């Protein structure tokens, strides 16, 4: 399968000629490369925000489970 992938690589001199012909386009590619390089750093905090809400609901359920038995214990002596 690697032999089939070689011909597209040999056809790339057209792109190389386009880069040499227009320095403005090559500069635009460099700026675009910088922008794409910054994007992964922006995605990482978003992944942390997604992970945090998953932990909070589990922690919110535990205190609610602890509070319910206490209320039931307080009500029981009043009935007696």
UniProtKB/Swiss-Prot annotation:
Keyword terms, alphabetized: Chromosome, DNA-binding, Nucleus
Stretches with biased composition (Basic residues): 11-80
Location of region: Disordered: 1-80
One of the record's GO molecular function terms: DNA binding
Signal peptide: none
Keyword Glycoprotein: no
Subcellular location: Nucleus; Chromosome
GO cellular component, one term: nucleus
Primary localization: nucleus
Coiled-coil residue spans: none
InterPro entries xrefs: H1/H5 (IPR005819)
Gene Ontology BP terms: nucleosome assembly
Protein name in UniProt: Histone H1.M6.1
Natural source organism: Trypanosoma cruzi
Lineage of origin: Eukaryota, Discoba, Euglenozoa, Kinetoplastea, Metakinetoplastina
């Amino acid at each position: 399968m690697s032999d089939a992938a070689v011909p597209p690589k040999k056809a790339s001199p057209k792109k190389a000629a386009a880069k040499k012909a227009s320095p403005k386009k090559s500069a635009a590619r460099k700026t675009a490369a910088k922008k794409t390089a910054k994007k992964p750093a922006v995605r990482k905090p978003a992944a942390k925000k997604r992970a945090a809400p998953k932990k909070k609901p589990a922690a919110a359920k535990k205190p609610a489970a602890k509070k319910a038995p206490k209320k039931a214990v307080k009500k029981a002596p009043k009935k007696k």
